[in-house]
């Protein structure tokens, strides 16, 4: 788990969120409003919301439109979350069942961490037993 993750608010623009993800080398950002988790946005969400290269708009028109798009418009609302006392196994099962790559960790309505696929893999590789084959 990453404790005290970087969060953004719904009014953050698409370019701002993209820059933050790039600068911090992260792919997911919990979205917090008035101290409460209201959504999550991924790098995939940002890419999907970005215009295609095949557009007929000029670069100036594109930049204008993108600069006005907020995270609140593209985020996944009310994301599935866990508490800090949730077991790693339960978190991994939930991620697998729901086909999601991360879970915000929330205690007393406050985002205290985020667990990602990478955290699960890291734990498995460094502390768990890895079977030599899938058979």
Each model region followed by its residue ranges:
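Tandem CBS (Bateman) regulatory domains
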Residues: 1-4, 42-80, 87, 92-96, ...
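A glycine-centered beta-loop-beta connector
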Residues: 21, 29-45, 95, 103-119
């Amino acid at each position: 788990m990453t404790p005290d993750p970087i969060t953004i608010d719904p009014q953050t623009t698409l370019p701002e969120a993209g820059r933050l993800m790039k600068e911090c080398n992260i792919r997911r950002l919990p979205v917090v409003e008035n101290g409460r988790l209201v959504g999550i946005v991924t790098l995939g969400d940002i890419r999907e919301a970005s215009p295609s290269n095949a557009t007929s708009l000029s670069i100036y028109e594109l930049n204008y439109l993108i600069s006005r798009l907020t995270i609140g418009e593209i985020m996944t609302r009310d994301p599935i979350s866990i508490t800090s006392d949730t077991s790693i196994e339960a978190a991994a099962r939930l991620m697998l069942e729901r086909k999601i790559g991360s879970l915000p960790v929330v205690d007393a309505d406050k985002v205290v961490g985020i667990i990602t696929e990478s955290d699960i893999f890291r734990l498995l590789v460094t502390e768990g037993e890895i079977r030599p084959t899938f058979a």
